[in-house]
Amino acid sequence: MIFESFILENLVFLCMKIMNSIVVVGLYYGFMTTFSIGPSYLFLLRARLVEEGTENKISATTGFITGQLIIFMSIYYAPLHLALGRPHTITVIAIPYLLFQFFGNSKKNFLNYGYKNPNSIRNFSIQRIFFQNLLFQFFNPLFLPSSIFMRFVNIYLFRCNNKVLFLTSSFIGWIIGHTFFMKWIEFLLICIQQNNLIKSNVRIQSNKYILSELKNSMFQIFVVFLFVTCLYYLGRIPPPFFSKKLLEIKESNEFFKKEKKGDVETNLQRIRTKQKRSNNKDIFPSIFLKKEKNLYKLDEQKNKLQKPLLNILFNYKRWNRPFRYIKNNQFENIIKNEISEFFFHTYPRNGREKIYFTYPQNLSTFQKMMETKIDIFTIKKISYDDSSNHSSYSNEEKRKKLSNEFITRTKLIDKELISLDIFENRIRLCNDETKKNYFTKITDPFLNGPFRGRIKKGFSTSIQDEKTYKKNHILINKIQEIFLYNSKKIPKKNNRNYQKLEENLKTFNKKLLVTTFLFNLISQFSKKSVSSFNYEVLYLFPEHEQVKMNSNLEEEKKLIIKILFDAITTDLNEKTKGNRNNTKSIKINEICKKVPRWSYKFMDELEELGGKMEADNSQIRSRKAKRVVILTNKSKFFKKYNTYNDLGDTENTENTEKKNELALRRYSQQSDFRRDIIKGSIRAQRRKTVTWKFFQKRVHSPLFLDKIEKSLFFSFDTFKSMKIFLKLKIWIRKKTEFKILGYIEEKTKKSPKKEEEKKKGNEERKRIEIAEAWDSIIFAQVIRGVLLITQCIIRKYILLPSLIIIKNMIRILFFQIPEWSEDYRDWKRERYIKCTYNGVQLSEREFPQKWLTDGIQIKIVFPFHLKPWHKYKIRCNKKKKDSKKKKNFCFLTVWGMEVELPFSSSPKNLFSFFDPILKELKKKTKQFEFFTFRVLKVFSEKFKLFLNIVIEKAKWIINRIMESLKKSIVFLTKKRKEFFESLFIQWKPKKLDELSENKIDEATISIQSIKSTNFALKKKKIKDLNTKRKVVIKKIKKLKKEEKKRGLVISETNIDSNKTISDSKRIEFEKKNLQILKRIHIRLTKKSHSFLKFFIKKIYLDIFLYIICIPKIHIQPFIESTKKFLNKWIYGNETNAERTYKTNQSIIPFISKLHKYFHNRNLNSHNYFDVSFLSQAYVFFNLLQTRIININIYKLRLLFEYHKNFFFVKNKIKNSFFGAQGIVHSKLEQKNLLNSKRNQWTNWLKNHYYQYDLSNSRWSKLLSQKWRNRITKFGVAQNPNLTKWDSYGKSPLIIYKEQQGAALKKKIRKQYRYDLLSYNFMNYANKKDSYIYGYRSLFQSNKNIWISSNYNTYKKNLFDRISNIFIKNYEDAIIIDIEKNSNRKYLDWMGIHREILNRSISNPEFWFFSKFVIFYNAYRSNSQIIPIKLLYLHSKVSKVNKNVSEKNITRKKKRIAVFRASKKQEDIEKNSVAVGRGSEKNSYVIKKKKVKNNMEVELHFLVRNFLIFHFNWKNFLGQNIFHNVKVYCLLIRLTNLRKMTIASIQRGELGLDIMIIQNQKNLTLPGLSKNKNNKLRKKELFVIEPVRLSRKNNKQFLKSKTMDLSLIHKNKRKIDKKYLKKIHVNKKSFYKYITRTRDQKITEKNEKEILNFLVPENILSARRRRELRMRICLYPNNRNSIHRNTIFDNENKVKKGFQVLTKKRNEKEKKKLMNFKIFLWPKYRLEDLACINRYWFNTHNGSRFSIVRIHLYPRVKIC
């Protein structure tokens, strides 16, 4: 087993070693390079398939393989790689290839040596194929960008050590891959031939085969295919031959090159010819006054011809990658990213090898090469001991030198010889060692620091002054060079300046230069400035001498002037300097190093449009824009303000025109991907990218398509597709439901305003698309402009007059008066104004510049609309304010239509002529309908009356007939009965009479008995009668039998007897039926009552309740929706509707009073399951549900029926309920209070509900009522006595808006009392521990405490909630003006003190606003550290609102400057400030201040209207500015400009934010033009925007609060008797003194040292303190809640109702209390902490959560 495992391990190790070997990796990468298929494969396949003969095929393969081998060799061999990589070397290789191709295609054989073997290697076709495949391998990187697979070898070559082995193995791998590839292609071709996919016997009409035709035209097809592939790849790369050449800016040193003698002579000849032409007699021509005759241009032209051929063909400095050009005005050109001259290298020093960063690179590389090849250059390694000895010796020498220097310096200081040389020895550069002639300190290169002088950092010259900079910049002072040449101190050979001027100095006679003449020349230069100096007056010779000047001397003189002038003048803008400045410039140029820079300085297309440079010279692409000229130099505007430049020069006409024009830029809104790219640069090489979407953000490679999120059509996940299919199926089933729901939602959600906005947005988008389409098509603007002008002419002079004629002729035919004059007047009123492409108005006659290329618009002012008739009505002088002004203009389209905006797709009404006719027809039809309706109405009413009368009459007749018939029937029946009775009586025998009488009596008796009252007696009687009847019947039967026996019966008697028997039977049957009916009736009467009850209940439950529920189900959401709609309409915000009204989920609340008042079913509320909303209703409801022994529940009836807070509870209820439950007793004073960490309320909850083990139904009862929930959510309720910050703000509680006044005051007082009572009731403490909670117990001493309602609370908290504030409310928030510090004190502490003295309040923390308690106490304790300014930070509030300052009778001083709302609560309109809009009518009034100039007046006006603004400068045009530009262009052309501008401003056509034209007087702010250094002069637009800043008090205010909290406890100390009662501070710095109150003095005397700890409960209000305590008590992990008094209970130590403890126990108590305080906040739950954070900072987000986190782990000071 061990042997097998060993073998396996060795095999795995061997396999891994083989896999990681260089040979295998090289084979792999070489095989991968076969996939980098290029154009060379096309020639190889062509030779293998088309060429005949094996020699051609072999030559193609050998050429292909040799080319690939040379490429692999070039990877390792650098010179070969450079030769094949550079473009000019490839062109050298391409020329012989073209020759081979030319000779190969010709039919002649040029290399025919008489050898007849066609397959010989001397055959030219074989050589051509070989070189063709060889050279196209080299062209592969040129035509195709380098492939990924080809780069594998280059990348891995740097990683391996044995590079030669790697290259050979990769080449072998490439050969293997190549053979596989070729065999695979052959296999494919054989399969195609065998399957007869290409048939050779297909005939065409010309009876030619396809293959033969293909073979003949194969070469042409191949050439076309090769050309297409090259074009495809060259489209991605700009070709180097035809790329745009960039303009070069010559470097400063190029001009000062050496000039040959012949060049100077040619220059002189040119000067002579020019002088002869000009016939100028002066000897010295001016050099600076006429720049075109300057000699420097000749040198520039000459230097252009001296460029090498390679730079002309291929510029190596060109931008060959998509670099972005970053402009920098401080530099001329971009610095090249080249290799530095210095390199880092190690060198041994002081026994150690150190790195030198300034080591020459060539030396380091040479040294490495020599070390590898020659053994002499190998450095012997020095041992460690030798190196250490050497370094120690050198260090000792250094130490000695330093100590000696220090000693000498101290000696010199003692001698009081102080100089710079004492403190530092410097090395100086010397000219002569014997005489010790040193260089000057400025020119000495060995000196450092301020001795060398300071170089002023200046900006480089601009692009316009480049030529002057080149011509005037001098590196060498040539006059100084002459003096140096004459001096004997410096040799000629060592002088570099002399060598540069040696050739120029040979051309003239040096004897002419006398020193006096030179000094005269210099003095003249020094007196006058160079710019105003005329050099034609200069003479080098004195006036008293007369020298005959030959032609040669004149030429020499000119050369002298040239050289000397160049030597002296340093800059045109500066005066000539002394020798010191010249020497300084020389030495700086010698020391400074030339920085390699690109020779290009690029300009944008926008700068070209702006006129900063000549046309067609831009090198960087910018956003597509066109220059739209608004005003030209012929206009009155330029002449009026003296800006018209009437220049006579004809050369710079374009520049002068641009200066005298006012133009704007019009940008196209198309997507521009070429922005800021240099022209001629290579684009991104993205060959292997695929786009499969219509709009795709990023381009991806197809290799990574699996990792990209794809659409459904490109995904292969079957599970997802099945899901989508099922969803579609469900959607098809529920299609009808979706339609109904969608229809309802659209009706409810969509408003008409949104639809209008959408329509406007769609129209605007269509307009932009049409405009861009016209702009993108070639020659479209020309066609459009011509069509517009033709349409204008046709409309004005053909179409409209013809319509007028037709209309008036028709009127004549209809016998109406024609309206020739009216129509002619309207036609004459119509005018056509030419506008730019964007619609900027010019004039009627003036066309915009380049309107054929840039585009044009034609605006029709007062367009003519043909009317069927004209109205003659007197116009009313009064106009309605709300009526909108009709637009009396339109734009003309190409089709001759009228459009409101240019390029709009919705034309105006074409049939406006028929509109009044249709209106008249509608009126007539309405009148006819009204008349017919009245007639039909009357007719229908009359007809109804007639029908009613007829029906009533018919009914009456029918009733009378029926009544008569009934009477007759009744009469006949009576008669019939009487007749039969008479017959029966006549023929009746005696016995039968008796029997019948008995029967009749029985019947009458039985009937009467039934009607009797007693039912039992009646039953007995009926039974007796029945028995009697039976007896009678029996007797009758016996008698009949006897008669039959006797035979005495007669026939008549038999007939009568039969009749009597039948009658008796009938009577019996009727009797039986009557009895049955009577029994049923009796039963029904008994059960009717219960049945009716049951029936009514069923109807009520099944029918009536359902009917009642239907309107409730439908009405309730309807009412709530109407409420929401009204709320939205009032506030204009959807969020308020969600805040104020939350619907009740229950629909039919059939519940009791308790359930109705104390159960809240709003489960969707965010306060659900929240303990913080425990209310009194919850307590009483749970008390009622709990079982209590010996308690009368009816005592709580009043509490339960009262649906709001019952603030005061009677003692009986307290004792019975609270005492039984263990909460508290009413007589708290006389009992021992349980001073526990967990209060009694928590104990009660814990005992009954086991902390959090509550059901959902119980948790649902923890919510308070709806109105209280809203109040706690939105803060303080409304009260007229409250000091409000924002008087315009409206309370979101719309329901309670009617309850303002006295009722609302009472409710707030009750609520405040209840808060205080509940807090003191639940969180009581004795006097000793009262500092923990910051209050006094309510039940200790002052029972009759009165809570004042005249407390000042702010409507908004200190830390306002910003998330739900609408932007209109937010912009009117308080913003502090930092610039002005007014002396107004917003807190009058003296007034507060007076109020305190007047009131008898034991606890000042509750009448004062609860949030300010801690700050007030802090300032009262130590007012020296914390001023009022830090506490409240009220500086000057620059707010535009109506100040309603309430006067106080007790105090005559003016109160706080905080703006209070008036009692009427007037709705103040807000001033909405929009971008680019001017001044609007404002309802606010501020007192005007006296301002000195007009500038300040207008700025004050802006400040007053817009409150906060800043000047924003943009290059684009907004709608409002564009509208102002239109109006402004028309106003400029008018004569009376001032009146028209005022009128246009009054009409609202022109805003006050119009643009400021450059170098002109401003119409709105004339003071701005006086300021020279104003930024407004640089830009051309002036925009006013409202500042979207957060409030200034947030940041500083929060910081001050947090810092003040820490300062409070640091400065707490004992108050001695010596402590001053008043602290006087300077009033100007917002400090004031505070007097101590009487209550405070008492507390200060009894105050002891307390732990230096911030109590978090002091931050909260009374209600929120209760919330905090409840949350802490309900926290399940709070195990420290031990009853504190259980340990220390001792009855003997109880004295007068309070517990006395020893000092030790007090210390223990303090420690426990400290532990409680420390673990109070950290043990708190994060959710609860966030809730408290939201309440305190009044916000919904956690942005200020970090401030609360400060109090999590505070620093505890232990006494």
From Swiss-Prot:
The chain crosses the membrane at residues 23-45, 64-84, 129-149, 172-192, 221-241. The keyword DNA repair does not apply. It comes from the Eukaryota. GO terms for cellular component: chloroplast inner membrane. Keywords: Chloroplast, Membrane, Plastid, Plastid inner membrane, Protein transport, Transmembrane, Transmembrane helix, Transport. It is a multi-pass membrane protein. GO terms for biological process: protein transport. It is found in: Plastid, Chloroplast inner membrane. Part of the Tic complex. Involved in protein precursor import into chloroplasts. May be part of an intermediate translocation complex acting as a protein-conducting channel at the inner envelope. Belongs to the TIC214 family. This is Protein TIC 214. The lineage of its organism: Eukaryota, Viridiplantae, Streptophyta, Embryophyta, Tracheophyta.
